[in-house]
Regions:
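N-terminal "arm"/small-domain region of PLP-dependent enzymes with the aminotransferase-like
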Residues: 1-20, 24
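Phosphate-binding glycine-rich loop
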Residues: 19-66, 77-84
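Short beta-strand->loop structural element characteristic of the AMP-binding/adenylate-forming
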Residues: 70, 87-88
Length: 88
């Protein structure tokens, strides 16, 4: 895997800032990711569960809906469905 010293330095700087879920580094990442992918509609989340909940909400999933999922999935994959009042 690719690694250079500047990555460790930046990681230490981010951790020392106390802003690991928000702040200038998240904004910088979002802007860089959007530019690299040619898409200005980028939303970052702090974890996969919140990303799934946001995607489900934006897809119109809500109370009373059924969402197909795998029975061999971890709890984090199904909890956003239940949080929205839908049935996994």
């Amino acid at each position: 895997a690719y690694y250079d010293k500047s990555m460790g330095d930046l990681t230490n700087e981010i951790l020392a800032s106390g802003q690991i879920a928000n702040g200038k580094y998240v904004a910088l990442f979002s802007e860089s990711f959007a530019k690299k992918n040619g898409n200005s509609h980028i939303v970052t989340t702090d974890n996969m569960t919140n990303a799934m909940e946001l995607a489900l909400k934006m897809s119109g999933v809500g109370p009373g809906d059924e969402v197909l999922t795998s029975p061999f999935s971890c709890m984090a994959s199904n909890s956003p469905i239940a949080t929205l009042g839908a049935t996994p």
